[in-house]
Regions:
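Short beta-rich binding modules
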Residues: 1-172
Length: 172
């Protein structure tokens, strides 16, 4: 049994925690991690404010970063929602969801046809789970920890109008 537990030949962890470089384009598959809030329980309630968000996990599908997991919160309603001013957090989140739908369904952002408008509609937030799209990687750092190396997030979803879309999605 002891010979079955010999880890001398295992790879070192040197590169195991390296971040994916910012602005890298990757094909990902999105999963929503339900938080029990909002319609059908797909949203997560912030612990520090009335904000609601989608707690997502995106798995890189192919390429040198295949199988890497990227955790991103997509705003749905900000802490100022319902009060004075715009809901910037929620608006950014809705823009991200629109981008995910356009990317997954091959729709250009400037397409206003009935088919394109229909592609941007969902009946449930759960429909976002399982969608594959082109994501632009970003790096978020903890502002309270200046030495923080950060973590990868999906900064944007790229649609069919982006020059690299077809290559990353595997259409070309």
């Amino acid at each position: 049994m002891a010979s079955d537990m010999d880890f001398n030949g295992a790879d070192t962890q040197d590169a195991a925690f390296d971040l994916i470089p910012a602005n890298t384009l990757v094909k990902v598959c999105l999963t929503i991690r339900p938080g029990g809030a909002g319609p059908e329980g797909w949203l997560t309630q912030s612990k520090t404010s009335p904000a609601l968000y989608l707690n997502t996990e995106a798995v890189v599908m192919e390429g040198p970063f295949a199988r890497r997991r990227i955790y991103t919160r997509i705003g749905f309603r900000g802490k100022a929602a319902g009060g004075p001013g715009d809901d910037t957090y929620g608006n950014r989140g809705r823009a991200m969801i629109r981008g995910i739908l356009e990317s997954a369904r091959g729709v250009r952002a400037d397409d206003q046809s009935n088919a394109a408008r229909g592609a941007r509609m969902i009946r449930s937030l759960g429909e976002l789970s399982g969608l594959e799209f082109v994501g632009r990687i970003g790096i978020e750092r903890d502002k309270d920890k200046p030495d923080d190396t950060g973590r990868n997030v999906i900064k944007a979803a790229l649609g069919a109008d982006h020059a690299e879309y077809a290559r990353v999605m595997g259409s070309v």
